[in-house]
């Protein structure tokens, strides 16, 4: 009897020692968002996985996950959440999500929660802490897990009734040049006439040789496009900006890009805003069109801060150096300062293309004029 008691005591001590030093080994943590690029207030799902890859039974675990401070839970009202606020740094403001569960040997625990984010910006899923007791419940152990998952919220879509009107003449002139006036500088080949080509493209010499109607294939050296340039500097000789005006500019940039997409007009994008993440401090996207191109621009706008990486005059100088035939400019800025007028004039003079400047005040003025006409 004493032998069995000693044996049981030895097993108990061994299990306790093992649980203290090895009990929470081979546990993995991961959190994944169902979407990485979102609309403001769009619901998405964060799925958490805890993997347990050993024979040991874990009867009680508590998980504390650190999520972005502005995370909202529209449906799950029974989850345990506490929010940490700090006036020192926004990064110290967190939403802490608590969960308790147990894990059988070689078992994975999954937990999904529907959430949303209300404002434009870059948010991170960063870390979690897992607490578990030892075999006898005498002391607690903990594992800390680090991850780096980004969630980007695009600028808010704002309806600008006068946007088509303001851009109408600008885009109309480009469309006329693009679709009505070809610039065939080099003939690269010939193809059979299908009936859809204009009569002026028929090559009578090649048609006589081949015994059938042949049309010329051109290398069009002019590719008309629009460069959308977003400035966030609103105070001269300062990198700081007014947040509200800059946020309006980001939404306005989105509206401009949507109009260009609807018109099937190729466009590029650049901004002097500082952007968070791996993209870099100065961001630009080459000309293109389509969903992939559009969402690439939206990602940059979502990452952007209301702080400029360079003065607007330097941004305009870079634009002057990138001038090419057929390139037009839509400049979006919180306001137009007199110190920038010389650079804007230089950009206009350095190209035969058109330059249009849009500010939030442009739409406020247009709206007030419409109200006066209605009265």
Language model features: what each stretch is:
Residues 240-245, 284-289, 302-307:
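Short, contiguous acidic/charged loop-to-helix segments that flank catalytic cores in large enzymes
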Residues 11-277:
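An amphipathic, basic-hydrophobic helix/alpha-beta surface used to engage anionic
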Residues 59, 186, 200, 290-297, ...:
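Alpha-helical structural motif
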Residues 179, 193, 242, 286, ...:
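Generic alpha-helical structural element
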Residues 271-300:
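Short beta-strand-loop
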Residues 218-220, 259-261, 288-292, 320-322:
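Short, conserved, surface-exposed binding loops centered on an aromatic residue
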Residues 98-101, 151, 285-287, 296, ...:
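Generic detection of short hydrophobic beta-strand segments and adjacent strand-loop junctions
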Residues 1-22, 26-27, 45-47, 70, ...:
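Von Willebrand factor type A / integrin I
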